[in-house]
């Protein structure tokens, strides 16, 4: 953020020096052998100096952005190929159309990572940056909502128990994700060649809406799933949300939602940081949380592959041999 949002306070030595200037020195007799009291100017300058934070994701981090983007695109493309490959066992995964959409969301995120990366010169326009943030957060919101539905509905997604559910989920969840990206799309642009959110009084409402959306989707949603799982298990009301390895996805976005909320409170002066060090720690956490979100585009396809491998390894031995090969085709027909 650049500067600490607290007022600089003078040290006791500085306050004493000011009193000497105003009171004692007025009537202080001067002769050639006497000297004026020493004033600690260094303490005053240090207290009034602005607080600067070093950006962890500066121009030197461009290779990290590019590497994550390339690996994410390759991994997501591989998972999509396996999911749509005819007569392949991954099509037996419960809710594989939802899993395919997760891979699509990860691929979209990977594609826009270089657009928002620093160190690519000053050629990016505000429109391109706004589009980049729209896809960046839109794909993340869609993945989080898809994971929530996959956990809530569980095997129903793959058993054909709810006709037309896949199409309804696709339209509804991606539409909701697109609406949630409107605030950050309008409150972002290019500054000195870098894509960045725009913080101003006029756009404060948009930034607040975006912060609330991130906190609700990335923080409250996984906490709600865990809470529902625990409550239902404790009360004996059923298994609750379907807990799988895919829930690890939220680890990559949960810190971002928390730190983004803290940063907004500080910018709005609803939360005052006592020291410059606290401000620098918050800025560092913002950069680390952003780096963790970038890593998710590589981790998500790996989680999908591991989930499909575990699901098919458990499911295939329980199916008769002819049904093992007919099930993917039947699944495709029932979902179309």
Curated annotation (Swiss-Prot):
- What's in the keyword line of the UniProt record? Disulfide bond, Endosome, G-protein coupled receptor, Glycoprotein, Membrane, Receptor, Transducer, Transmembrane, Transmembrane helix
Q: Which Gene3D superfamilies match?
A: Rhodopsin 7-helix transmembrane proteins (1.20.1070.10)
Record-annotated disulphide pairs? 51-276, 129-195
Name the record gives this protein: Atypical chemokine receptor 1
Q: Where in the cell is it found?
A: Early endosome; Recycling endosome; Membrane
List glycan-bearing residues.
Answer: 16, 33
According to its UniProt entry, this protein's organism is: Sapajus apella
Annotated Gene Ontology cellular components are: early endosome; membrane; recycling endosome
Give the family, as the similarity comment puts it: Belongs to the G-protein coupled receptor 1 family. Atypical chemokine receptor subfamily.
Q: What job does this protein perform?
A: Atypical chemokine receptor that controls chemokine levels and localization via high-affinity chemokine binding that is uncoupled from classic ligand-driven signal transduction cascades, resulting instead in chemokine sequestration, degradation, or transcytosis. Also known as interceptor (internalizing receptor) or chemokine-scavenging receptor or chemokine decoy receptor. Has a promiscuous chemokine-binding profile, interacting with inflammatory chemokines of both the CXC and the CC subfamilies but not with homeostatic chemokines.
Q: How does it sit in the membrane?
A: Multi-pass membrane protein
Q: Which GO terms describe its biological process?
A: chemokine-mediated signaling pathway; inflammatory response; regulation of chemokine production
Extract the PANTHER family matched here: ATYPICAL CHEMOKINE RECEPTOR 1, DUFFY ANTIGEN/CHEMOKINE RECEPTOR
Give the transmembrane ranges. 64-84, 96-116, 130-153, 167-187, 208-228, 245-265, 288-308
**What is the first-listed, main subcellular location in coarse terms?**
other
Q: So which stretches are on the Cytoplasmic side?
A: 85-95, 154-166, 229-244, 309-336
Provide the GO MF annotations for this entry: C-C chemokine binding; G protein-coupled receptor activity
Extracellular topological intervals:
1-63, 117-129, 188-207, 266-287
């Amino acid at each position: 953020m650049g500067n600490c949002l607290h007022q600089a306070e003078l040290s006791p030595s500085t306050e004493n020096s000011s009193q000497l200037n105003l009171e004692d020195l007025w009537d202080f007799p001067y002769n050639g052998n006497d000297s004026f009291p020493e004033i600690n100017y260094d303490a005053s300058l240090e207290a009034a100096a602005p607080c600067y934070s070093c950006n962890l994701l500066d121009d030197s981090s461009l290779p990290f952005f590019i590497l994550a983007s390339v690996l994410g695109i390759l991994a997501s493309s591989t998972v999509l190929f396996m999911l749509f490959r005819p007569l392949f066992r991954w099509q037996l995964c419960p809710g594989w159309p939802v899993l395919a959409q997760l891979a699509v969301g990860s691929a979209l995120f990977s594609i826009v990572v270089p657009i928002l990366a620093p160190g690519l010169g000053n050629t990016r326009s505000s429109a391109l940056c706004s589009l980049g943030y729209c896809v960046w957060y839109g794909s993340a919101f869609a993945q989080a909502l898809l994971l929530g539905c996959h956990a809530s509905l569980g095997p129903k997604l793959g058993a054909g128990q709810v006709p037309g559910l896949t199409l309804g989920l696709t339209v509804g969840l991606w539409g909701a994700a697109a609406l949630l990206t409107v605030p950050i799309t309008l409150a972002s642009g290019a500054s000195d060649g870098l894509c960045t959110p725009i913080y101003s009084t006029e756009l404060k409402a948009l930034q607040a809406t975006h912060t609330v959306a991130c906190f609700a989707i990335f923080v409250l949603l996984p906490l709600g799933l865990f809470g529902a799982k625990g409550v239902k298990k404790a009360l004996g009301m059923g298994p609750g949300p379907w807990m799988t390895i895919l829930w690890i996805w939220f680890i990559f976005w949960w810190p971002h939602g928390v730190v983004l909320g803290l940063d907004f409170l500080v910018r709005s002066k609803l939360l005052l940081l006592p020291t410059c060090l606290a401000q620098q720690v918050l800025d560092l956490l913002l950069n680390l949380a952003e780096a963790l979100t970038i890593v998710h585009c590589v981790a998500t396809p790996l989680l999908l592959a591991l989930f499909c491998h575990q699901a098919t390894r458990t499911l295939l031995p329980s199916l008769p041999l002819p049904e093992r090969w007919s099930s993917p085709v039947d699944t495709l027909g029932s979902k179309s």
